[in-house]
C-alpha cells in the first residue's frame, strides 16, 4: 500500500512491535477499560456508505488538524485500495459504539505477523482513543495467537503524524532495505 517516495532520504523506517515482550502500561489498560462497551468485529474488508462517510469525516478532520490533503473517496477508490483482495489474511476491524461505526482498521493477519495497514475513526469519540485501542486490540490478538510481530508500517522519529508509533515499546526498526535475496536486519529499540 505505502512505499517511501523520497529517493535520497532514509527517514521512513519500517518498524514492528515485539509482541512477546510487550507489556500493557497503566494508561493502555485504561484505554482498554474505557472501551469495554465498544464492540469489535473482525471480518473480510467491505465497503458501505457508513465506511465511506466515516473515512471522509476522518480525512476532513485531519485536513483541518494537520493539513492533510483531502478529497472525498469514491466507492470504487475505496474498493480498489482496501477491499479488492482474494487473500484470506486481509481483515477489517470494525469498532461499534451505540450501534454506530466509530472506527475501522484494515489489517493483514498472517501466521507470523500482523500488519496494520490503515486505521480511521470518528474524532467525536476521541475520549475512547480508538486509534490506540485498535493497536492494543491487535497486540492482544497477536498474543492470543502467538504471533511474534505487529508491523505498524513506516516510522519517522518525532514526526507529527508517525511519531506516536514509538510509544509501543519494545519495537524494532529495519536497518537495511533488503532485496528478496538478502536478509532483513532488525534493531531493538525502547522508547
Predicted regions located by residue number:
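Conserved acyl-CoA
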Residues: 136-148
Amino acid at each position: 500500500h505505502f512505499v517511501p517516495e523520497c529517493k535520497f532520504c532514509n527517514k521512513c523506517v519500517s518498524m514492528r512491535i515485539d509482541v512477546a515482550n510487550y507489556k500493557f502500561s497503566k494508561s493502555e489498560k485504561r484505554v482498554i477499560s474505557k472501551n469495554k462497551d465498544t464492540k469489535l468485529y473482525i471480518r473480510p474488508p467491505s465497503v458501505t456508505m457508513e465506511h465511506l462517510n466515516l473515512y471522509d469525516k476522518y480525512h476532513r478532520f485531519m485536513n483541518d488538524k494537520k493539513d492533510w490533503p483531502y478529497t472525498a473517496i469514491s466507492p470504487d477508490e475505496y474498493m480498489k485500495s482496501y477491499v479488492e483482495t482474494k487473500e484470506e489474511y486481509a481483515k477489517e476491524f470494525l469498532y461499534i459504539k451505540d450501534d454506530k461505526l466509530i472506527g475501522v482498521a484494515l489489517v493483514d493477519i498472517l501466521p507470523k505477523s500482523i500488519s496494520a495497514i490503515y486505521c480511521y475513526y470518528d474524532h467525536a469519540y476521541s475520549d475512547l482513543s480508538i486509534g490506540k485501542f485498535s493497536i492494543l486490540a491487535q497486540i492482544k490478538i497477536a498474543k492470543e495467537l502467538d504471533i511474534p510481530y505487529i508491523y505498524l508500517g513506516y516510522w519517522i522519529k518525532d514526526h507529527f503524524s508517525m511519531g506516536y508509533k514509538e510509544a509501543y515499546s519494545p519495537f524494532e526498526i529495519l536497518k537495511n532495505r533488503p532485496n528478496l535475496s538478502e536478509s532483513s536486519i532488525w534493531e531493538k529499540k525502547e522508547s
